[in-house]
Amino acid sequence: MSDFKQKVSELLGTQIEGIGQRELLEMIEVPPNSEMGDFAFPCFRLAKTFRKAPQVIAEELVAKIQLTDDFEKVDNTGGYLNFFVNRNTYAKAVIQEVLSKGDQYGSRNLGEGKNICIDYSAPNVAKPFHVGHLRSTVIGNSLYRIYDFLGYNCIGINHLGDWGTQFGKVIVAYKNWGDKAEIEKEPINTLLALYVKFHDEAEKNPDLEDEARGWFTKMEKGDEEALSLWKWFSSETIKELKKIYALLDVHFDHYSGESFYNDKMDVVIDELNKQNLLKESQGANIVDLEEYNMPPCLVQKKDGSTLYATRDIAAAIYRKNTFNFEKCLYVTDYSQNLHFAQWFKVIELMGYDWAKDIEHISFGRVTHEGRRIQSRKGSVVLLEEVLNGAVERISEIIEEKNPNVENKEQVAKDVGIGAIVFNDLSNNRIKDISFSWDTAFSFEGETGPYVQYTHARASSVLRKAEVAITDHINAAHLTDDVTMNVIKTIEQFPQVIVDAQRKNEPSIITRHIVNIAQAFNRFYHDHPILVEDEELKMARLAVVQAVKQVLSVGLSLIGIKAPEKM
């Protein structure tokens, strides 16, 4: 086990009473540069307990701590304890662990097989899959991979928006201006054009809105014509969506859209009634949340039709009963914060103790060059266009720089789509993103292609070496600052995965694999690898193999391929 941070916490635990091992572990920091040690422990939080100045506490601990052979020294500076590892021992332990664990390096059984439901993507049927949907899809997909890697049993759910008043609008538009042959030829774009036309015409003729509501009511009452059109629109849209999911290498365990819960809503209404949680307000049924500083949660309209909140409550109850989840995560943008807070509170008021286990994983919105993406106005950037454009762009670069690369169509696909996904996941999820073609296709700096190219570079070195890589190395060759920086970033990787899971933040992994790539490229530039000295060569090749392995795992956890050649 190469977890030197754990070893530091164990040394501290022998001298510090009243603080648990886990808390000590979380207090340990990695200094910004190696002159300040490899691990640092701030004594400021101990000042109140020990009734001494942090500097004094640090001095006393330095005098008491008995170092093992894993460490060269410990000193104190300004209230910090600074631990310096034995570089030889450290390098060998890290490299051995990575090479022995292979593609399972960083994997842990934290979840012990417990079920985690992750609700992500969830586009609307009969509307296009635009770049605004990308964030939920790729964040959810990455969280699925991270939780799975840490021993949870993940259930990926696509809660399709396949029910609602928009279908009434599309039916009205189709009956007034639609062409069946056009829809069969190009379903998504034709349905979008009809949806946009409906809103344009409704501004001039508001009666169309009433007509649309009427068609949706027919759907809810089981009208044969309305349901037949709805099923047709839905099946055509889902076929197109699955093509895009295949491009993104995203999968779901369940496609259960809003319509799946049509027969489960009355039970929710009845239960709310029995618990005296429902109040009538202007003919509609609400749950009053004024006591919790929230507007009322509307669960049933005046005409008896249900709303998103009702369906979400029904879905959550169904998921708990079906999957008995440890957690249920909902990956949607922050504009829905209030909606989730409201119905989460309703679940709690209904007496379900698992209300604490459902969580909204919110993220910032995507705008297109400063404007919000809205399908009703037609101002959308279709995701399929972006992905295909990225693949074409990479194909051009390959033809220019390396036209003889094997499987160049597949490489172009892996790198082009990887660039788009990486661009999204390199940002903290809560940040708004302004989508622009130039940014999405930029391959300079901290980008997906940069990390993928680093993986391909490491793969190339290993192919040229034509030797079996082993962890039986002389680690004395790996103790210089540049090489140690590579090894440190590798050693931190397992904790980075855990941090990403705890915070539900894939960008933590994305940023770290950029750090690994940068550290490796400095190592590659400064240190010839295929040298005459066999012992030195094998030690450096072991570092190359470890980097390749960790980059491959890291890219996989964010849903990106790791090409062997580029």
Swiss-Prot record:
**Listed GO biological process terms:** arginyl-tRNA aminoacylation
**Sections of the chain in a coiled coil:** none
Q: Which GO terms describe its cellular component?
A: cytoplasm
Record's subcellular location: Cytoplasm
**CDD domains registered for this protein in UniProt:** Anticodon_Ia_Arg, ArgRS_core
Question: What are the protein's GO molecular function terms?
Answer: arginine-tRNA ligase activity; ATP binding
* Chief place where the protein resides: cytoplasm
Record SUPFAM superfamilies: Anticodon-binding domain of a subclass of class I aminoacyl-tRNA synthetases (SSF47323), Arginyl-tRNA synthetase (ArgRS), N-terminal 'additional' domain (SSF55190), Nucleotidylyl transferase (SSF52374)
| Keywords, ordered alphabetically | Aminoacyl-tRNA synthetase, ATP-binding, Cytoplasm, Ligase, Nucleotide-binding, Protein biosynthesis
Q: Which Pfam families match?
A: Arg_tRNA_synt_N, DALR_1, tRNA-synt_1d
EC annotation?
A: 6.1.1.19
Motif 'HIGH' region: list the residue ranges: 123-133
Name the chemical reaction catalysed here. Answer: tRNA(Arg) + L-arginine + ATP = L-arginyl-tRNA(Arg) + AMP + diphosphate
- Please name the HAMAP family in this protein's record: Arg_tRNA_synth
**Family note:** Belongs to the class-I aminoacyl-tRNA synthetase family.
Q: What assembly does the database describe for this protein?
A: Monomer.
Family annotation (NCBIfam families): argS
Per its UniProt record, what PANTHER family does this chain match? Answer: ARGININE--TRNA LIGASE, CYTOPLASMIC, ARGINYL-TRNA SYNTHETASE
This chain belongs to which protein, by name? Arginine--tRNA ligase
What is the native source organism of this protein?
A: Alkaliphilus metalliredigens (strain QYMF)
